[in-house]
Amino acid sequence: MPGFRRVERLPRQLLGISAFEGDVCPTRVRLFARGSASRTLPFPHPWNYRQPIRILESYFCGADAEQGWGRHNRYLEIPGFSPIFVTRDPRIIRAIATETGDRPGQFDRDALPSGGIARATGTDTLLYANGPMWKRQKKLSTPPFGRTTLFQPEQFHEFAETFRRTVRQRLAALEQRLGREGSPVRVRLEPEIKAIMLEMLANNFFGAQISYQQIRDRYVPALDRVIEFIVIDTVINKLGIPLRRLPSFSRWIAEAKDAHAAFDQLTDLTLATRSAGRGLWKQFKSDAPDRALRSNIKVFLAGALEATTSYASWAISHLSRNASAQDKVFHEVKDIDDYTPENLASAKYLNRALDETLRLTPSLYFFPRRATADTWVETTDGNRLWMPKGTHVLLDVWHANRHEDHWGVAVTGYPALDFVPERWENVTAHDRGTKDLLHFGFGHGPRFCPGKHLGQLEVGLVVGAFVKLFRFKAVNRECQVRAGVSTKPADGVLVELELRERSFAESTAATAPRELNGL
């Protein structure tokens, strides 16, 4: 908040007068409230930053006892600071997301929660930039991600072949474990999913030629460490000191530097294929030098890997706890031998299961925005909210998607907290299409995720093929959420796994290398 506005707002803040006006009246959240049932303070600090979902929950402590707009819209205001507005109301989320862009008076993406990402990748990125710079980055970076590019049969076939090759290798490893331990085998799938996703990103999308062993043993662990450092750096590094300037006085800093070096090497390998026009570089029409693209490539590698791993991990986790849904997906995909765009689109129950995954457990649990001017926000039903310039906005899609008011029995026919792909059939039957019920899984409005179609392609391939090959059941009855940059199942997708058709597995594994040590 600039100096004059800071002083101007101070009397109202001290008197507890709301900064917001209009039909939508958010309820104030007290920083410290006697008798509060909240389990943490409503902002990240060194003792709660690993629990961001709980931080968002703290804004809505006791909110379900309210009626009116304050039930789903809250704000925190501390004298001397800009207000923080948090909403789990889909109407407000949609309105603000729609009005996020580069035009005067529109919302920016709030850079405050992304400081660690910017220090790790660069500020000149589609993720971090705002205004005209964001518009330039969008024009430069997004063409290869379009549906018309990714869903061409030739490109789709390349992704399918990579996955098929990887599955053959993993089947060989599984056969070894089955021989040693019998069936079923207990497996933590998240590391395997992450390696498969990174292989498709690096080798198919960018046309690199990196061995699966290198991806799994070097680059995936390095990116995990980079992501972990980004989260910690965002909360703790208030001075914005780059990692390269920190002395390696601890093992943690030294390991973080090694991980960033591996990340740089992976970025080099993906950029090296540009001159040859391999992968989707052939769709990239720009004279920009490699150094101008480097930051966006790093954001893409880390961000797309996080998002697609989260998406696929949650889908498999949900299906592992819902045998009926898993069987329905299997009967739909069991006869698919060639993964074409048409075949994936025809797998309607699989696609409903994926939509339900994004609703119940979105990869990105909130979207940060900031008001660039005093502004009115108007919902599709005509209600209005005025907020002052500088307001920090958190669009809390995690709790919006899981609330009974928005997705419960009265609206969709099923409880909001249950994983029910049939929910989407019910929605369609009652003429409530995607314009009325949005899961915001890829964001919304001008700043929606440019990797949406890539995510749909990769996760559709992985989940469809996985269900076709394996029968799996969760080890733990319930699964909590683990959240950092994205959300993931806290148990790492721990399942008991067995092959559906041993004869098929044996014939497939017979042609695969057997030097891998197991899942």
What are these regions (language model features)?
Residues 395-430, 513:
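Conserved cytochrome P450 K-helix/beta-meander segment immediately N-terminal to the heme-binding cysteine loop
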Residues 47-70, 339-381:
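Conserved cytochrome P450 K-helix E-x-x-R motif and the immediately C-terminal K′/meander segment
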Residues 323-326, 444, 448, 452-489, ...:
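Cytochrome P450 heme-binding "Cys pocket" and the immediately downstream C-terminal segment
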Residues 357, 390, 419, 445, ...:
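Hydrophobic, well-ordered secondary-structure elements that form the walls
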Residues 248-252, 350, 355-369, 491-519:
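C-terminal domain-closing interface element
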Residues 1-123, 128, 132-136, 162-169, ...:
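N-terminal membrane-proximal hinge/A-helix region immediately C-terminal to the signal-anchor transmembrane segment
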Residues 307-320, 462:
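Short, small-residue alpha-helix embedded
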